[in-house]
Amino acid sequence: LFLLLSGLQIFNAHPSLYWGEASMFNRPILRMQAKVENGALHGVTTVFGHPFDTTGLLGASTYKGHIASRGFPGWLTIPTDRDLASGRRWHFFFAWLFAINGGLYFAYMLVSRHLKGDLWPTGADLRAIPQSILDHVRLRHPEGEAAARFNVLQKLAYLIVLLGLLPLMVASGMTMSPGLDAVFPVLPWALGGRQSARTIHFLCAWSIVGFFAIHVFEVFAAGFFNEMRSIITGRFVITYPSEPPKPLDMDAPP
């Protein structure tokens, strides 16, 4: 949470995204700005050249009782005021904690074989993808012993985050540092330039937010109390599907 909100503070210093090595001001991928129309300040968010009125949320939002020009609103940034220096300090402090914690967790996954044993999908898992998608759409969750294991969509989602989004987030964050670019010149080359890295960093962050939101929804849908108890204590109660009642035999003797 601190990484996201402090990152939005940093983004607000220049609320636009580009692709390549340099900022192409006339061709932004994304731009949040404020424009004056009929004497009033309006927020306009432009995505691939298509403008949208986002007054009150993006581009222009209420700050200390009046509409002010800023990318994301103050309630979504740390600190609330426009303070790039403080935002960078918060971001870099928690970035180190994130990187160290992530490295230790990845080492644990390898040593404990959690990655291969629990998260890596088998051939049978991959063949079950269509049925798993259908079950999720219907909010139908596994019962019995199957409920204690990750289904194939969970496995793929965790692998995309753990082996894709999170490493890419770290690499793109490092690429935005001129000092690290000098030490590791392969970084901006691999990611298509520093502005591309900034765009990738932004997209990865919101992809992880989306993953988290879906994850929380699934916890509620699958049974909040049982799921949270298993997360906190490791105790998961397995419920078995009840057998349908047998039809009465009307011809049987009393």
What are these regions (language model features)?
Residues 1-254:
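Membrane-embedded alpha-helical bundles that constitute the cytochrome b-like, heme-associated redox core
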